Design a protein with these regions (language model features):
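Active-site metal-binding core of divalent-cation-utilizing nuclease and nuclease-like domains
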Residues: 1-69, 76, 138
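Short secondary-structure transition/capping segments
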Residues: 12-13, 78-87, 117, 142-158
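Residue-level signal for functionally critical sites in structured catalytic/ligand-binding pockets
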Residues: 15, 33-35, 71-73, 86, ...
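A structural preference for short, hydrophobic beta-strand core positions in alpha/beta folds
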Residues: 32-34, 99, 125
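Residue-level detector of solvent-exposed, low-hydrophobicity positions
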Residues: 33, 37, 41, 94, ...
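Catalytic cores of nucleic-acid endonucleases
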Residues: 65-67, 74-123
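Domain-level recognition of nuclease-like catalytic cores that cleave nucleotide substrates
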Residues: 104-153
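Polybasic, lysine-enriched low-complexity intrinsically disordered terminal tails
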Residues: 147-188
Length: 188
């Protein structure tokens, strides 16, 4: 449940509509679990507690591994209280945490993620063009951000390997002259 106790009705409808559009978008590649409004359909275990993100993407193979957690925010729900109450626990999970925010709130969301050290894998924006919702990727974390840093770098060998000799380039056949047509050349 969101720390915003009562979200305005119009924003709640927009929030739930974005969740359903994301479900349709990811339906072919993942098993999608959604939690619109106050519903608690798809849970994610985090230590001893259970979390209910807006969208849970599960792999379609036998293991049904969690691939990503998606949290959708509206203009009023992008705030510090929301970031600490929901984004921080989602960022601590093993699966990738994706954040969807309105286009005008992108800078605020990025600043909150950096200030609170929330490891978000991707931030996307959404906006309406006519009667169609557009989702645009705005930020993608470096690929090694979730990889453990305990691996030592591989030692370089003492002697460098000799490079193979480059083969000479093959000659291309000469270009054929253009065909003559019955037309006169174009004037410039």
């Amino acid at each position: 449940m969101s720390p915003i106790l009562v979200r305005p009705v119009r924003e709640q409808l927009e929030h739930d509509r974005v969740i359903r559009l994301l479900q349709a978008k990811f339906r072919r590649r993942f098993d999608v679990g959604i939690n619109p409004g106050s519903e608690q359909n798809s849970a994610v275990a985090s230590g001893g507690s259970t979390l209910y993100p807006d969208v849970v993407l599960l792999s379609q193979d036998r293991g049904r591994k969690e691939m990503a957690i998606i949290e959708v925010e509206t203009v009023e729900s992008v705030n510090g209280l929301e970031a600490l109450a929901e984004w921080v626990p989602f960022g601590r999970l093993k699966s990738a945490f994706h954040l969807y925010v309105p286009a005008q709130m992108l800078d605020v969301a990025r600043r909150m993620c950096t200030d609170s050290n929330i490891p978000v894998a991707e931030i996307h924006t959404y906006h309406w063009i006519g009667d169609e919702m557009r989702f645009l990727p705005a930020y993608k974390a470096p690929s090694d951000s979730r990889a453990p840093a305990t691996r030592p770098a591989a030692a370089k060998p003492a002697s460098p390997k000799p490079k193979p000799k480059a083969k000479p380039a093959r000659k291309k056949p000469a270009a054929k002259p253009p065909k003559k047509t019955g037309r006169s050349p174009k004037r410039k």
